[in-house]
Amino acid sequence: MFGTESSLSMFLNTLTPKFYVALTGTSSLISGLILIFEWWYFRKYGTSFIEQVSVSHLRPLLGGVDNNSSNNSNSSNGDSDSNRQSVSECKVWRNPLNLFRGAEYNRYTWVTGREPLTYYDMNLSAQDHQTFFTCDSDHLRPADAIMQKAWRERNPQARISAAHEALEINEIRSRVEVPLIASSTIWEIKLLPKCATAYILLAEEEATTIAEAEKLFKQALKAGDGCYRRSQQLQHHGSQYEAQHRRDTNVLVYIKRRLAMCARRLGRTREAVKMMRDLMKEFPLLSMFNIHENLLEALLELQAYADVQAVLAKYDDISLPKSATICYTAALLKARAVSDKFSPEAASRRGLSTAEMNAVEAIHRAVEFNPHVPKYLLEMKSLILPPEHILKRGDSEAIAYAFFHLAHWKRVEGALNLLHCTWEGTFRMIPYPLEKGHLFYPYPICTETADRELLPSFHEVSVYPKKELPFFILFTAGLCSFTAMLALLTHQFPELMGVFAKAFLSTLFAPLNFVMEKVESILPSSLWHQLTRI
């Protein structure tokens, strides 16, 4: 025992200050690299790498989780409803107010050099186009067969070329000989029906202005309306005709909706409202396009608040899916009744009136549904062009809503002031939003990951609830700073730090030496001698 202690003391005495400098410097470097990796992993995936490895891999090895236990199966059965709800809330929806690629998105790229749409977003749009604009019988018509391939094409120029090719095929005239007299014949010219989906693609992607897009959509409307009427008469003749009629219906609804949006962009708002109302009456079951959200935005532009309230009364129902447009428009109407006279100082003195309480509750309801919107309405975060798809309750939906509705909030005097004074009070009602909500289901945890796929990389995705730094990042940062400080002090004051290091090690081993001395005093010397030899 005494030999071991003396050899340890000799080893410590032979260590030079350079050794301590090298030791602390190496420790600081390693902990710094770990810190950088942990921070990068946390920013990209939202969790600590060390914590994830510990929970996912080390804990099962240490026996912390029993995968075969009955408790696990019971808990999984009990959580099935919440899991299904989480999956439904993380569904990606088509943005009803999406912009035009050629006339709006591409112009932004030409000016800034940035791509406003992600590959994931455009791929979802390609899938939507194949679902809405194609059917199994397209191979029977050459133009539709070309367009079926065009919707799958990734290269924009290749898609545009395919659309022109489809239109050129339809320009081919079939000539039929009709004998009039034995010595002469004439040719009857017969035009093939136009390809409506080709005009749609050109209007969306090739037209560089809204006016050009509107002209192409009007040509698409002529072709699409004819195809719709023909397939409507034949839809009961078999499943193939029924699928073709369903496709033609989707094409016609899409064209009319985009024409209404063109009219809205060009300032013909009343005309746009009429087109949207007619479309909703003609096709009341096609709720997938969410045309009522386009109608709400146009009515707000006209300041027709009574009509807005009538639309909300129909669609702001407990049985229907909610959206930021529904919730925040309802809050705007409630705020409009009191916002011009609202004062935080007066409200704190006399309390809130019934109308003010209703407005505050409507704002809290809207903020609970989508907590990202107020930062854009209050211009605490800069807006970008909205994506073609949104995630309800996510940052993408907040951008899409604020991009079109910020002007409507500014137009109502005092509405933004009321929002500024009350929106943060929502979070006091739901301290644990991922576990339990107040008026809605708990906030889905999948929004951040999906929004990072939908939104461009130059945009900083808004995260809710704000994540705290994991313990391992804080621990690594402290360890890195501490070892770096030790290395610096050892380099500047080598002799003094050597004395401190020896004193620290002596203090560290003092309890062990005390225990060993007690053991030596209790055990016989002969037995202790035998144990040390072993």
Swiss-Prot record:
The keyword Membrane applies. InterPro entries: ST7. Pfam families: ST7 (PF04184). Keywords: Membrane, Phosphoprotein, Transmembrane, Transmembrane helix. One of its GO terms (cellular component) is membrane. Residues 66-85 are annotated as: Disordered. This is Suppressor of tumorigenicity 7 protein.
